[in-house]
A protein has these predicted regions:
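Catalytic beta-strand/loop cores that center a nucleophilic Ser/Cys/Thr
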Residues: 122-125, 132, 229, 240, ...
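Extracellular ligand-binding/catalytic regions of CAZymes and related secreted enzymes
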Residues: 21-26, 32-63, 241, 339-420
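Helical hinge/lid and interdomain linker segments adjacent to catalytic or ligand-binding clefts
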Residues: 22-23, 28-32, 63, 67-72, ...
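Alpha-helical scaffolding within the catalytic cores
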Residues: 95-100, 144-146, 355-359
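Sec-dependent N-terminal signal peptides
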Residues: 3-14
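Extracellular/periplasmic catalytic domains that process cell-envelope and extracellular macromolecules
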Residues: 105-108, 149-152, 214, 341, ...
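Catalytic cores of eukaryotic secretory-pathway lumenal/extracellular enzymes that build
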Residues: 181, 196-197, 236-239, 244-247, ...
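Hydrophobic targeting/anchoring helices
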Residues: 19-125, 134
Length: 420
């Protein structure tokens, strides 16, 4: 009888250990495809499984229950992983408890929207490239859908490289005679007229205010390149006209600068407008300025991520998960943000050390959050109009693209009380 009981006990222990096995998608330098790994985590959430995000553990790894379908998906997508026994899982959690690490539970796949004209191609926007490569589903919305109230269906919104001031990207001096520029103007003017606005700038302001309401109600906003500074400029200039006559048919108001209301903006204050239509720059927020870029060169241009306390500041820690701390810089219409113009309550996540350039920032507004990342494409140092698309299959371990994908998973995290 004792022999039978012993065999039963051994079987029970073995069964228990089998059940406790998990899959670790490690995110350090040994990972073969960091970007696809985010897609697998999202895929698990889509299928009703929870995912543990191990902040600062091996580059911000993912831990999830073992199952054959998951392993098959990992192999298909070329993502490296390892199986952990119950004892190994305990060791991982002991390490996390002891070090500057933490575990965040991801519970639900966030519904993702991208603000972009319907005819934009994925390669026009680094976030669309990241979503496509990681195989994460998204919906494209533009002005009509936003003003119709459709943002409320989504947890997370990315702003395309949009100019919310109505100045068409300040491309007038160089591209006003090109077909694509004329098409851009016509498309926006047609939409403004359709929706009952006398100017494109007034339409874009209405969109910006709707997005602000969305964030205040609990939405997650992520913006890159010119959608960062022009968004705040539109909010600040709500009661004035900063557009030159070539953009909207009448001159900018002479006192537009004095009438800016910085209390309405998310991230920036005390900036100075550059309203000359022949100058390829919006304001002095952008550093280095687009009209007089001071290039350090792709080999010398880096920015550094700050290290935060994972247990006391999990949000900033989530947004800065990466397998390296120094990340290659990259240019854009808005490359970076002048530190002296960033509001004091905004958290700086990454900056170019020894300079005034903030590259990556985050803040709260109402019940929601906003995160801004300067530059156009983390793997295309100096992007030009009509450049070929970046092939992410050649950049599967891109630290810069990981920052984008951190933001996509961020809304899935369960909120928990901070330790005191």
């Amino acid at each position: 009888m004792r022999h039978i009981y012993f065999l039963f006990l051994i079987c029970a222990i073995s069964f228990s250990n089998a059940l406790s096995q998990k899959i670790l998608i490690y995110m350090d330098l040994k990972q073969t495809d960091h970007l696809k790994a985010y897609g697998v985590a999202y895929w698990m959430l889509q299928h009703g499984s929870q995912v543990e995000w191990l902040l600062n553990y091996r580059g911000g790894s993912f831990l999830m229950d073992e199952n054959p379908a998951l392993e098959r998906e990992l192999r298909i997508r070329g993502v490296s992983y390892s199986r952990l026994s119950g004892a190994e899982i305990s060791q991982v959690h002991a390490t996390i408890d002891r070090e500057n690490m933490d575990t965040v539970l991801l519970e639900k796949a966030p519904d993702i929207a991208v603000y972009a004209p319907p005819n934009k191609q994925a390669w026009d926007d680094a976030v669309l490239l990241a979503l496509e490569y990681a195989e994460i589903p998204y919906t494209v919305l533009w002005d009509e859908e936003v003003l119709r109230g459709e943002l409320d269906k989504y947890d997370w919104l990315h702003l395309h490289h949009e100019d919310f001031t109505g100045q068409y990207g300040k491309f007038y001096a160089s591209y006003r005679n090109t077909d694509w520029y004329k098409d851009e103007v016509a498309k926006n003017e047609t939409m403004a007229k359709k929706l009952g606005y006398s100017k494109v700038s007034k339409l874009k302001l209405a969109v910006a205010l709707t997005i602000k309401q969305y964030v205040g109600g609990g939405g997650f906003l992520f913006a890159m390149c010119s959608a960062t500074d022009t968004y705040d400029m539109a909010l600040a200039a709500a009661n004035t006209d900063l557009c030159a006559e070539v953009f909207d048919g009448d001159p900018a108001e002479a006192d537009a600068q004095q009438r800016l209301d910085f209390s309405q903006t998310f991230a920036f204050e005390n900036f100075t407008l550059l309203t000359n239509p022949l100058v390829y720059e919006y304001s002095d927020i952008d550093i280095p300025p687009s009209n007089a870029p001071q290039l350090r060169g792709a080999e010398a241009d880096y920015f550094t991520l700050f290290e935060f306390s994972a247990k006391y500041d999990p949000v900033a820690t989530m947004l800065t998960q990466d397998h390296v701390a120094a990340i290659k810089g990259f240019m854009g219409q808005t490359t970076g943000f002048r530190k002296g113009l960033v509001k004091k309550h905004v958290v700086i996540l990454g900056e170019a050390e020894g300079t005034e350039q903030v590259k990556y920032l985050h803040g709260n507004f109402g019940k929601g959050t906003f995160t801004f990342l300067g530059g156009h494409d983390p793997e295309d140092y100096q992007h030009f109009v009509n450049d070929p698309p970046t092939q992410l299959a050649l950049h599967t371990n891109s630290p810069g693209y990981r920052l984008i994908l951190n933001n996509i998973l961020f809304p899935a995290a369960r909120k928990k009380k901070l330790k005191t």
